[in-house]
Amino acid sequence: MKPIKLVYDKYENDLGFYHEDIDSTIEDRETLKGEILKLLPETVSGNAINKDRHFKIFTWGIKKGPGTDCDLIFDATTFQTKIDSELDVHSLNGFSEEIQDSIILHPKFLEIIERIVNTIEEKKPRTVGFYCNHGKHRSVGWAEIMKKYYYKNTTVKHLCSPRKNTRQ
């Protein structure tokens, strides 16, 4: 399976605007996150998203070793986010609210999550993979966001994460 890139080059991470329906003057991160989450896609091609879908999500880091064979694979290696400079990124992982919020606050988040959900709904995979460089922040964060906001019945297995390796 050829991986689907979440972003194609590092410049896509630097776009300075959000969805047209979001007030560009909002500076509070929580308010901005709330506005973004209100715009999460609920349909694909006019059909409701099957949030009861059962499948497995795997995450891994390509620098930590091989991943696993999946029906769909999403590449987050060039996806970058910004977090508060006072936070120690080494003490965080994709389970951390700060990491998940940084993904949600990415300027292309709505476009990317819509593409992921559309692909899952179209292909109906049994297994989905997310990988990044180390399998700790981005891939884990994306998998946890997919479980939290869309596919609550998935089983998530983090192949490189030291904490909560498998979640039902």
Regions found by a protein language model. Give the residues of each.
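Structural alpha-beta junctions
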Residues: M1, H19, Y149-V156
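Cysteine-dependent PTP/DSP-like catalytic domain, specifically the C-terminal lobe
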Residues: E144, K152-Q168
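Short loop/turn motifs enriched for small/polar and acidic residues
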Residues: W60, Y131-N133, L159
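Catalytic cysteine-centered active loop of the rhodanese-like fold, especially the PTP/DSP P-loop
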Residues: V117-Y149
